[in-house]
A protein has these predicted regions:
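Catalytic Walker B motif of ABC-type/P-loop ATPase nucleotide-binding domains
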Residues: 153-157
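ABC ATPase NBD coupling module
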Residues: 52, 64-85, 111, 123-127
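The feature captures the beta-strand-to-loop junction immediately N-terminal to the Walker
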Residues: 33-35
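ABC ATPase signature
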Residues: 91, 132, 145-146
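A short, proline-enriched helix->beta-strand linker immediately N-terminal to the Walker B motif
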Residues: 147-151
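Conserved ABC ATPase signature
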Residues: 128-132, 136
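Helix-to-loop junction immediately C-terminal to a conserved catalytic motif
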Residues: 48
Length: 170
């Protein structure tokens, strides 16, 4: 499980999250909903270490990871697919997926498995990332994250730009 305990997160001097405590267990699906600007993205960034904690603790399993870098937290198997698509526009879909598999942790996610759940990417393997629609870029971002075989995958606006049939597959 990953959790924040009595966490404060600041943007400069402004308090963005105050005394927030949240726990998400492995293999649990949780949706965080709220109005724009409520702190949903900030919460996800705090969980993965992209936002430092001004107070409180960040815990993974039974390990305090409050002082670990985002890279160290990623190596422990926590991945975030941000709301802004992170792909390499000058690389092909296949090359983008191969980069995702470099940080490969043992598990069942392979390029072939990703292409099974996102068949549209199979059709676009030779296309550059900048030639993809927004929904295809989102599929590629999620696929790259899955290839790291994370223990925990956090998704920010995961269905943005995806067709309803793809959302159902996810």
């Amino acid at each position: 499980m990953i959790q924040l305990e009595h966490a404060n997160v600041k943007y400069g001097q402004a308090l963005a999250l105050e005394e927030i405590s949240v726990q998400v267990d492995f293999h649990e699906m949780v949706a965080i909903v709220g109005r724009n600007g409520a702190g949903k993205t900030t919460l996800l960034k705090a969980l993965v270490g992209l936002m430092p904690l001004a107070a409180g603790r960040r815990v993974l399993g039974d390990q305090d990871i409050s002082d670990l870098s985002v890279e160290s937290i990623a190596k422990l198997g926590v991945a975030l697919v941000p709301d802004t698509r992170r792909i390499f526009p000058n690389l092909s879909v296949h090359e983008n997926l191969k980069i995702g598999s470099i940080a490969h942790r043992p598990g069942h996610w392979t390029v072939d498995r990703v292409l099974e759940i996102f068949p549209r990417l199979q059709e676009r393997l030779g296309f550059g990332g900048d030639q993809l629609s927004g929904g295809e870029q989102q599929m590629l971002s999620i696929g790259r994250a899955l290839l790291g075989n994370p223990r925990m995958l956090l998704l920010d606006e995961p269905t943005e730009g995806l067709a309803p049939v793809i959302v159902d597959q996810l």
